[in-house]
Amino acid sequence: MPRWSAAAAVVAAAALADAASGATAQADHPDWGINGTYTATSNGEWARKNDFFYEQASRRSTWTVNTMCSYPGECTGTVSSDENWTAPIYSRSWIWYVKHPIDNWVPCPDGSTAPGLQTFRFKAMTPDGANADPSSTTLVGEDTTIGPSGACGASKAVYINMPFKLVKIG
């Protein structure tokens, strides 16, 4: 039997043995996701509006997060906030993203409003925020909300960015 045929036979036998034993690939690993209840804090003291410091009210809410992961750092799920919104959550390369629309976010001089899109981007860090730590229950990043260019008759988008922190509480 040629050498490559013997190797192919060994690989095929191993595959059949796995199939016969009922072994299956695990698509979700609970340690890869972020599941549970978290305190979400957006620090308005360090907010920027269109790249200039512009103090905003800080916001604190409670999130319930449910995720499933196909690979480490590749996850999807849902976030439910006690501020009465639910949005998808996903991660790419250990960075998490949550995006949700906000109705009537930009007030216009004529009394009308325009919507905004709020995006949270964060990753697991040491509690002091100095180093990445995938096993940490403290996640830090940014909370960015953008209003559409052209809203209120102005051709410049409204952009507010502030530091963000997510801490597991349950």
Feature map (PLM): residue ranges:
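Internal, hydrophobic beta-strand segments that form the core of beta-sheet-rich folds
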Residues: 116-150
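Tryptophan-anchored aromatic micro-motifs
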Residues: 29-53, 79, 139-143, 166-168
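Flexible, membrane-facing loop/turn or short amphipathic-helix motifs
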Residues: 45-54, 106-113, 147-157
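Edge beta-strand at a domain terminus
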Residues: 140-170
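Predominantly extracellular/secreted and cell-surface proteins with exposed
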Residues: 56-126
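Secretory targeting and sorting signals
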Residues: 1-27
